[in-house]
Amino acid sequence: MAPSVSGKRVPTRTKARKRALDILFEADLRGLPAAEVLQAHTEQAEPPIREFTAELVRGVVANQADIDALVGAHLPSGWTLNRMPRVDRNLARLAVFEALHTDTDQAVALAECVLLASELSTDESPTLLNGVLAAVLRDARPAV
């Protein structure tokens, strides 16, 4: 683990998630394909892009339509993905992909998303994302 600005150690996967968010956010902001932004970051990045970062970005890209439909179906009345702040929209995509398509525990993916939202977005974002993503994950679980 590497130290953060606050002096606390930041887990490797947490850093990879943040970097994936940076790439997805940049692509969204600039109107570019996320795969293109990932490629540019991979060629220029120091330190190098971690495989987990690339896996997250590629996974969101490959599953974005399905992820957006899941998130959109669980937004509060009157809300759309486009109404969400860019950071929140991309955090939601990242968390849903990670929770449903990787070996990461769903609770961990949700908690990491909420933590990043509390650091990077509005005061209301952690609560909104927690509620929306908890509903998405609850409904996406296979019936036992």
Set out the residue ranges of the language-model regions.
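N-terminal interaction/assembly modules
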Residues: 1-144
